[in-house]
Amino acid sequence: MSSVDLDDLVEKICALDLCSAAALVEKIEEKLGFPKGGLMASVSAAGSASQGAGGAAEAEKTEFIVMFDGYAADKKIAVIKAVRECTSLGLKEAKDFVEQEGSRELIEGKKYKKAEAEEVKKKLEDAGAQVSLK
């Protein structure tokens, strides 16, 4: 593959929205034969094994649910756009989702890896949403 092809590939990857990028990572991990849960899960497991029987260290949580808790009224449009970027919702569905009362899962049943959850949380908070991770 030439450097021009690689540059084009990098540009296309950088243009992906967050959800598409996550799907790409999962497909690459699957293609390369990484264990379920990805490379970070195997690195974490190796780190835990190296601690030995010296103590029962609490396992760090690796999967998170992104909870949408609300938004700043003056940032409604930006929040709707951010929700659309982070989900596969259309404009009307994203608007309805944002306008619902109470705390709810961003994508019902979806568990994010820590880095991805933090990225989604930051994107939504930058837009004006109140978000928590569970």
From Swiss-Prot:
Which HAMAP family does the UniProt entry name for this protein? Ribosomal_bL12
Entries under CDD domains matching the protein: Ribosomal_L7_L12
- Describe its partners and assembly state: Homodimer. Part of the ribosomal stalk of the 50S ribosomal subunit. Forms a multimeric L10(L12)X complex, where L10 forms an elongated spine to which 2 to 4 L12 dimers bind in a sequential fashion. Binds GTP-bound translation factors.
Which Pfam families has this protein been placed in? Ribosomal_L12
Q: What does this protein do?
A: Forms part of the ribosomal stalk which helps the ribosome interact with GTP-bound translation factors. Is thus essential for accurate translation.
Show the GO cellular component annotation of the record: ribonucleoprotein complex; ribosome
Q: Which UniProt keywords apply?
A: Ribonucleoprotein, Ribosomal protein
**What domain of life does the native source organism fall in?**
Bacteria
Q: What is the name of the gene encoding this protein?
A: rplL
Q: Which GO terms describe its biological process?
A: translation
Name recorded for this polypeptide: Large ribosomal subunit protein bL12
